[in-house]
Curated annotation (Swiss-Prot):
EC number annotated for this UniProt entry: 2.1.1.190
Protein name listed in UniProt: 23S rRNA (uracil(1939)-C(5))-methyltransferase RlmD
Span of domain TRAM: 1-66
Active-site residues annotated for this sequence: 405 (nucleophile)
Reactions listed under catalytic activity: uridine(1939) in 23S rRNA + S-adenosyl-L-methionine = 5-methyluridine(1939) in 23S rRNA + S-adenosyl-L-homocysteine + H(+)
Species this chain originates from: Francisella tularensis subsp. novicida (strain U112)
Biological processes annotated in GO: rRNA base methylation
Top-level lineage group: Bacteria
Residues where [4Fe-4S] cluster binds: 79, 85, 88, 169
InterPro entries in UniProt: 23S_rRNA_MeTrfase_RlmD, MeTrfase_TrmA_AS, MeTrfase_TrmA_CS, NA-bd_OB-fold, SAM-dependent_MTases_sf, TRAM_dom, U5_MeTrfase_fam
Gene name of the encoded protein: rlmD
Residues noted as binding S-adenosyl-L-methionine in the record, renumbered to the chain: 280, 309, 314, 330, 357, 379
Length: 449
């Protein structure tokens, strides 16, 4: 016998509520008769009239009908596509208020997820001089929409189902962000325009690179068009037909100089990278972040430092200019290979790089057993560094600088270090790597008691 399914009925009418907080994705939160209601484009302290758009057992969703009381932190969004495009979530909030909110989120999560952890000092936030045009890495969806009769290029809409119809992106580097319409119009000229799925963008200190993910082969005429487009716009164009191992550079062809994209994390160091390598999205904040990490490590010429989750050596190589020795450990072997090449190309001789899965036991590894360190830098992915923190006493480091792209996992790991491993949290703060979004980069300093 089939079981009847109960459907919650949507409340009809106009209702009023005060916004008390922001959700993880930037929507306002109101409590209505004890039930959580998510209302986009609202800010804490605002009173709004709203109508329901969706209901479930544990929460409701709604849209604003009228702002009864507006927050002093409200500003006019600088982008005309803000209410539709899901690329940004906080453009209606002043940049000062964005930073304050992110800083408070870090403090709250350290306390609640970290089981009572509180930093002795709050670091002043690292700010960027330009909150627009900062983004040098992005994956842009590509889709032909027959109803619109055109190719869309950009981020998903807020509901996540479709691509947003945009003509520019103000947070992308203008070398790409100002050319969305030009790029989409160009794709329409290709024979397989309906079979291009994605553009992966990476911009170094001088030029943009674009990986074109295609599901059908290009014709020779298409390839000539791609080369011509790349030449006219000073782009490097790569093609990808399947997995990452199928990526190759279409333009420029041959043995050219420079051979790779590159950026300078610190004076005197050039890091070469491929467009699908992980690099930080915001060059300005990245340089400031590296400088702050070096200051917080309080490096002397006799220090031996280990950099875990080191990637291409973004921190490792600048740190090597100040320390006696530095060891970088990274889970992706190809990035380790490139980090070694970069050290050689920059004539840096006091670093070594190793490949290892840092989410598994590492007690049998050469880099763990054959070296001694007194300080550590951690820069893990969103999953955090739980395995490292659970075994931190085996490293016997007196100071840890932890850089995080996820405040929740930083808070969890801080709880391990402070509550279980005899470290104290000296200081913590945020760095505005991602203006106008809910994402934030954080940094924390732990010291052995």
């Amino acid at each position: 016998m089939g079981r009847s399914r109960h459907h919650n009925k949507l409340k009809e009418g106009i209702f009023e509520a005060e916004i008390t907080a922001l959700s993880h994705d930037g929507r306002g939160i109101a409590k209505v008769d004890g039930k959580t209601t998510f209302i986009p484009f609202t800010l804490p302290g605002e009173v709004v009239k709203f109508e329901y758009t969706f209901t479930k057992a544990k929460f409701d969703e709604a849209k604003v009908v009228e702002y009864v009381k507006k927050s002093s932190n409200r500003v006019n969004p600088p982008c005309e596509h803000f209410q539709i495009c899901g690329g940004c979530s906080l453009q209606h909030m002043s940049t000062d208020a964005q930073i304050e909110h992110k800083q408070q989120t870090l403090i709250n999560q350290l306390k609640y997820i970290g089981n009572g952890v509180e930093p002795e000092n709050i670091l002043p936030p690292l700010r960027t001089s330009n909150t627009e045009g900062y983004r040098n890495k992005a994956r842009l969806g590509v889709r032909y929409v027959s109803k619109k009769g055109k190719i869309l290029v950009g981020f998903r809409e807020r509901n996540g189902r479709f691509l947003a119809d945009i003509d520019k992106c103000i947070v992308l580097n203008p070398l790409v962000g100002d050319k969305i319409t030009e790029i989409s119009s160009f794709i329409e000229t290709l024979s397989i325009y309906q079979h291009i799925a994605q553009l992966e963008i990476a911009i170094d200190d001088t030029r943009p690179a674009m990986i074109v993910r295609h599901l059908e082969p290009f014709t020779n005429e298409d390839l000539e068009k791609l080369r011509s487009f790349a030449q006219q716009n000073n782009y490097w164009i790569y093609l990808q037909s399947k997995g990452p191992d199928t990526i190759f550079r279409l333009y420029p062809q041959g043995d050219v100089e420079p051979k790779k994209l590159s950026y300078q994390p610190a004076a005197g160091i050039d890091i070469g990278f491929e467009p699908n390598d992980f690099t930080q999205v915001n060059n300005d904040i990245n340089k400031k972040m590296i400088k702050r990490a070096i200051e917080l490590l309080d490096i002397s010429e006799n220090d031996s430092i280990i950099d875990l989750f080191c990637g291409l050596g973004n921190f490792t190589l600048p740190i090597s200019q100040h320390a006696k020795t530095v060891i970088g450990v990274e889970g992706e072997p190809t990035m380790v290979k490139r980090a070694k090449e970069t050290a050689d190309n920059n004539n840096i001789t006091n670093v070594n790089f190793y490949a290892a899965n840092l989410f598994e036991s590492f007690e049998d590894k050469e880099w763990f057993n054959n070296f001694e360190y007194n300080k550590m830098l951690l820069d893990p992915p969103r999953a955090g560094a739980q395995e490292v923190c659970n075994n931190i006493e085996k490293f016997n480091v007196k100071r840890i600088v932890y850089v995080s792209c996820d405040t929740a996992t930083l808070a969890r790991d801080a709880g391990i270090l402070v509550n279980n491993k005899d470290y104290k949290l000296i200081s913590a703060g945020v760095m505005d790597m991602f203006p106008h979004t809910m994402h934030v980069e954080s940094i924390a300093v732990f010291e052995k008691i």
